[in-house]
Amino acid sequence: MRDQILSLALLLCVLHSACGLYFHISETERKCFIEEVPDETTVIVNYKVELYDPRSNGFMPSSPGIGMHVEVRDSDDKVVLSRVYSSQGRISFTSHTPGEHIICMYSNSTAWFSGAQLRVHLDIQVGEHAIDYANVAQKEKLTELQLRIRQLLDQVEQITKEQNYQRYREERFRHTSESTNSRVLWWSLAQTVVLVCMGFWQMRHLKSFFEAKKLV
């Protein structure tokens, strides 16, 4: 029981975490990230693009003409989202299949030979953590207690989705293992049959050779 409580607490900590980082790319470079997402889960991507200024030797807010093309593909390699956004924005989508979702970003700039550097601030929020509860409380006129209950219910729902996703991964892994074992077995049987046939053919060949030489 204690181990289950510790596991649940650890999972809650993971669910509350978000991915915040920044990275540098050129105006023609493509950068992709892989996010494992359960089905029917909301994902929010916040980003901001800054352009390198050689005069100040730092990064400044990018010009209005520079935007980001964002493309999202699900685990079946189907395009979930693909469009050009401004230099700063908030993107939201809902997963319909569990698994790895690939989020790719690249500048819409056509300055092929400028070599300008861009700094992209990126924050990916998945599941319950992606919900703006302050906005929810204001819209639905919830008290502090009601809002807390709503958060706990969303956390339980997200935990259920995570558990279902883990079972889905285990099932896929088991299917892959069984398929691999089956292929290994059939390959071993095929090798055995080939070796037996080769041995039989060699015995026939040696017998014919000895009979031709009148040794038998």
Swiss-Prot record:
Subcellular compartments: Endoplasmic reticulum membrane
UniProt motif (Prevents secretion from ER) ranges: 213-216
Record-linked InterPro entries: Emp24-like, GOLD_dom
GO cellular component: endoplasmic reticulum membrane
Primary location: endoplasmic reticulum
Lumenal topological domain residue ranges: 21-182
Protein name: Transmembrane emp24 domain-containing protein eca
Source species of the chain: Drosophila ananassae
